[in-house]
Amino acid sequence: MGVPLHEQGDWIREVADLGYTDVWSSEADGADGFTPLALASVWAPSLRLGSAIVPAFTRGPATMAQCVAALADAAPGRVAFGIGTSSNVIVERWNDIPFEQPYQRTRDMVRFLRAAVAGAKVRETYETFTVDGFKLSQ
């Protein structure tokens, strides 16, 4: 078990003071991939923030766009967003979501996120999902 999130502030500040430039978060069986980065954005405003890796399956497209946009808004110019297929264990066994067409799902999510984060109102049928009229309010 790692350090609880509420106890990581001093550690994150020390990492920045020691000259590290980045902190990265993953998503598997602990905290989600975004919350630790949001906290780090406040605790150490000089650090770049990265997700390595957020699963393309475990959030719907609109929710994923909201998470990415919120973190980018909290830490302008400091976010590297990593997304990937994850695994059948995390997707199917832990989240009860069919782990089908993982490459296509990731590709479709990236295409959707590019449009949504750029401010487009997305009405699109992708190979693995459909979005009908989502627009981030920024």
Spans of features found by a protein language model:
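N-terminal beta1-alpha1-beta2 module of alpha/beta enzyme domains
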Residues: 1-52, 57
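Internal, glycine-rich beta/alpha segment that forms the wall or movable "lid"
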Residues: 65-138
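Conserved N-terminal glycine/acidic-rich loop preference
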Residues: 12, 20, 57-63, 77, ...
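Glycine-rich loop at the start of a catalytic domain that most often binds anionic cofactors/ligands
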Residues: 36-46, 62-68, 96
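Short coil/turn segments at secondary-structure boundaries
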Residues: 28, 55-62, 97-101
